[in-house]
């Protein structure tokens, strides 16, 4: 006998486009509600590539006054091979949100 239960997990991150392309613009949105950076006044996107083998950049995020969500837009470096790896931090309080030490990843668009 199985019980039917539905669970709604909070979605902290959205990547646009879903498969970012090298040399093109990418926007990462972060919803801090319910997470460790919920009370942060400043959030930075910590961005690397391919398992964080290399740190690409730290990108200051802007907070949308209406939704309260954070947003950062950047150009995907041509040197990115397989995926972007990223997490978020509050530089003023030294607090990180790294998805339980798993970070987040976005697959880079394939070039055919």
What kind of region is each of these model predictions?
Residues 1-112:
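Glycan-association/targeting regions that enable binding to alpha-glucans and other polysaccharides
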């Amino acid at each position: 006998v199985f019980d039917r239960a539905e669970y709604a997990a909070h979605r902290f991150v959205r990547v646009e486009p879903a498969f970012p392309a090298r040399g093109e613009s990418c926007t990462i949105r972060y919803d801090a509600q319910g997470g460790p950076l919920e009370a942060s006044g400043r959030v930075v996107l910590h961005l690397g590539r391919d398992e964080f083998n290399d740190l690409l950049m730290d990108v200051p995020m802007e907070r949308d006054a209406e939704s309260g969500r954070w947003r950062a837009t950047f150009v995907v470096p041509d040197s990115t091979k397989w995926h972007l790896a990223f997490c978020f931090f509050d530089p003023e309080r030294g607090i990180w949100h790294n998805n339980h030490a798993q970070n987040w990843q976005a697959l880079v668009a394939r070039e055919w």
